Amino acid sequence: SYTAKVYVNDIFAGEHSRSGYTPFRLDITSAVNFGAENRIRVEADNTKADTMLPHNGDFDWADDGGITRRVTLEIREPDGIEYMHITEQIDSMQNGLASGTLIIKTNVDKPCKVTVCDYMTGEKVCESSSLTVPFKNLKLWSCCSPNLYLVTLKTDNDILEERIGIRTFETKGERVDLNGEEIYLKGCEWMPGSHPDFGMAEPLDHSIKCL
């Protein structure tokens, strides 16, 4: 829905408005009854307005209302890891392999350990005790070989994992280069939520099957 108001134990916890079908997160610590039962209420409103898409006009996507995705509760440490932003600085590429440095930005300012493993095999390929992680001869991600790695950031009381692919992507006029080689982008239009049995509440496994 276009707008959602969240209440915890009848206490207003926050609002998500004018942002369309995007995920959001709220801190509900002050409204929680620890050690007791809690009640979460989400009021979804799909009323159109001039202040947000589709601006009271025509549109070509499903306009279902309601709660269309999961609502989850996260228990976090006060100084826990909220996010991990990873930038790949590639120094060299040869024969489908790359060497360089992973530069990580996060909200925590405390000692940490970073581990990088092959996503399919679980084999550890590099690690560091800082947010700068040198790597050597990691497999490049490409359309034909979508190699992935799992980056794990760990502190004394929290852990966060992110999947990444090592690649370069740039445009040169009308040309698009992936890993230094020109590619031709092809695709098709698929609108999530268009299935008559599910609408915008289409299950993830069904979406994956369609893809």
Each language-model region and where it sits:
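Non-catalytic surface loops within mature trypsin-like serine protease
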Residues: S30, N46, I75-E77, I90-S92, ...
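Extended acidic/polar, glycine-enriched regions
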Residues: N33-E37, K105-K172
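Well-ordered beta-strand positions enriched in small/hydrophobic/aromatic, beta-favoring residues
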Residues: L26, I40, V71, Y149-V151, ...
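Surface beta-strand/loop "capping" patches
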Residues: P78-V108
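Outer-membrane beta-barrel proteins
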Residues: G14, F59, I90-S92, K139-W141
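Accessory beta-strand-rich segments of carbohydrate-active enzymes
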Residues: S1-I81, D109
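Active-site-adjacent substrate/metal-binding segments within catalytic domains
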Residues: S1-V8, G14-S17, E74, P78-H85, ...
